[in-house]
Amino acid sequence: MKRNRDTKMDHKSGKMNANDRNQQNNIKQEFKSDLNEAANAQPKYNFNIMVSDAMAKTSKQLLYAHIYNYLLHNKHLETAKQFLKEADVPLLTGNNNDDVAVKNPTAATLSQNDLNPRELLPTKMLMNANDTFLLEWWEYFSSVYDFVDTSDLSALQNNDFLQDRIFPILPTSNKVPTQRYSRQQSDQVQMNQNSTGNSSRSGMGTPIANPSNQNYQHSSNPNSGTPTSTANNNTNNNNNNNSNNNNSKQFAQQTLNSQLQNGVVYPSNQNGQQHARRPQSVSSDISNTMSMDEQQQQMNLLKQVNSQNPQLMNNMLFQNVQQQSSSSPNTPVSANNVDGNGQFPISKMNWNRIQRERMRIMRQQQQIRQQQMQQQRPQPNQQQIQQQQQRSQLPQQQAQQRIQQAKQQVSQQQRPHPTQQQVHQMQQMQKQLQQQLQQQSVMQGQQQGPMQLQQGQTQSQGQGQAQDAQQQGQPLSQQQMKQLRNGGNVDSNIQQQYMSMMMQMMMLSKNNQQIPQQMQQQMMQQMQQLQQQQQQALQQNTGKPQLSHQFVVPVNNQVVTTPGGSSTSARTKSNARSTNTNKKKMETVSKKNNKRSDINSPATIVPISTPTSSDGNIISSTQGTNFPIVNLSQAPTPTSKAEGDGEAGQNKKRRRKKPKTPNTNVSASTPTAGNTANSTPVTTSGVNSSVVGSATTSNDKRTPSNTVANNDGSMQTNVNELDIGLGMNTNSNNNNNNNNNNNNNNNNNNNNNNNNNNNPNSNSRDKINNNDLNMNLDMMSFGNSASSMGLNDGFQLFDMDGFPNDIMGS
């Protein structure tokens, strides 16, 4: 023991015995030999598993990986083996290609059975440096923890840089924070007691301690744990802080009082004392109690005071300090609180308050300016408001219009155009409808005779009354107007609708548009209604007696009826053309016709419908009149040598004076006034009567005729003054008859012109040009005869003036 003490003493003194030196040298040699063996030894690695810091999930595993790597690099193999057994090292499945192992890492687990006692695991480190990550790790943590361990608690507490802004809610176990917290509470109580009674001053903001509050910390000893030696200093500092706070309060109050003296008046409190309030409420008081001009003046004064605020407030504060020192000599002003110029420095808290007041005053000025601008701005009228609203609505309306136009364009583009097959089908439908109309008109014409026979007397009486009323200048009644028109058996409304739909279908077909199915269905329904009405009319007429001879003779725009050989009555249609001479001639002609007529089969002339204009006047011309069917089935057949001779036979017949055939049908006409010498034949333009059976016609000396033989054996007589056109056959085409009709139409034009020239008192509607008549003739030529469009049923296509009459619902 004594030797050991000696060696220790020698070690402290730096001196060692010879034995000790020899023993130490022997130990070093043995350790060097071990190190050489370890350095020369080559460990065996198991490359199936590797240690990698990339697979570390915690900081502890990361540290273990670098410790193991450090042991391998320094050849501490035995320590590394033991470390693998005890530490949780992050492992990675090994691979021959190290890059692949790093890119696609997979975690692995190590068991003691898998690892040979003489084997080690290789390392694959991502964070590897010359000094190794382990050294940097320990240097970082040592620098952190050494600072904490070496420094005292008081020094750490003094480094609280935010101590003036952060206040603890509950006192801590340390004595220093509790003293500071209690002192701050006492300061707040004193500030509340020294206030002038305004509760709003307590909400000006949290109290900020002066820099002098930190004196007790700097005066304390950093080596001592408790500040016992600074009790007296703290009391002195508290007194100084209280005096400073009082001075700052008085300074703020004086600055506000100076503003009150410059003209700003605030309302008083309950005790009658005036007190200062926050400038935010000043704006409301000023705006409520003063006019705009007074407010502007007050704001100008405030602006001047604020521009001189720094120097003015410093001077006022210095004066306040002097007054306090004179009033209370026991509390002199120390030199530390006054700068070299003799002015008291403004605290940061008061300066912030002053700046906030300035900002509020500027906001108040801006509000006043905005109010003045609004008052000076002229208010818009109602018209201007409406115009602005309309302008605002214009873009919306334009957008809606554009949307509608776009929709229409899209719908037009998407609308399917009719194909050629559809157009062909439409044309076939039109042809079928025309054929059905022709067949219906023929069937109705064959059965219309008995009905016209019964209605003849009543119609003739009504027409006579209407014509008498027109001649006397009296207005016609609605019943008389209806009697003048030939209503027929078919409803005119259905015909009008049918024809209007036909026109629409034709326009659609011309424009290559598709015909809707609804229109086609309506057409078929109207066709069925027409057929039903015609069948009902036929059923009503069956069983009634039918006469063998039915004549309709329109003589110079007059209707003559001779039922059973009785006396005839002639009534004129127009005032200008009805003269006494014409009446006398008509009576003589009618008497001669009655004498020459067949006794066994008396002729009955059925009245025709007289076209009237929209104002109720009767149209004088015979254009557009509708003739009923003339039935001459029982008349004897004519015998003539000129049958089939054509034009040559016609010329020869004109030279003959007396016909050899007996007279079965007599028709006569009287020439118009002023044209008795050279009279021209008059025909109904565009209207021909269909003949059933055969007929013979003959004329007296005053009415020379031209008899023409038809292909079917019937005869046609062309009268110079009047051409009834009985030779038209509805079942077959006849070229000769067509030529004769064209010639008669030309003659009719001339006759109408002569009538217009000879009758100066005629109406303007009676004056018709040749072009208009030719146009009407062209429009009336449908099929073989006028009956193909149902003209015999009271269905007029065109009126005198060339415009549609009954089609469009005149």
From Swiss-Prot:
State where composition is biased (Low complexity): 219-248, 321-338, 441-484, 678-698, 729-763
One BP term from GO: regulation of biosynthetic process
Kindly state one GO CC term assigned in the UniProt record: cytoplasm
Keywords assigned: Activator, Cytoplasm, Nucleus, Transcription, Transcription regulation
Q: Where in the cell is it found?
A: Cytoplasm; Nucleus
Q: Where is the composition biased (Basic and acidic residues)?
A: 1-13, 584-598
Q: Where are stretches of biased composition, namely Basic residues?
A: 651-660
The segment(s) forming the LisH domain are 59-91
Polar residues biased stretches: 173-218, 564-581, 599-640, 666-677, 704-720
| Protein function | Transcription factor that regulates pseudohyphal differentiation, invasive growth, floculation, adhesion and starch metabolism in response to nutrient availability.
In which family does this protein belong, per the annotation? Belongs to the MSS11 family.
Q: What is this protein called?
A: Transcription activator MSS11
Q: What is the organism field in this record?
A: Vanderwaltozyma polyspora (strain ATCC 22028 / DSM 70294 / BCRC 21397 / CBS 2163 / NBRC 10782 / NRRL Y-8283 / UCD 57-17) (Kluyveromyces polysporus)
**Lineage from the top down?**
Eukaryota, Fungi, Dikarya, Ascomycota, Saccharomycotina
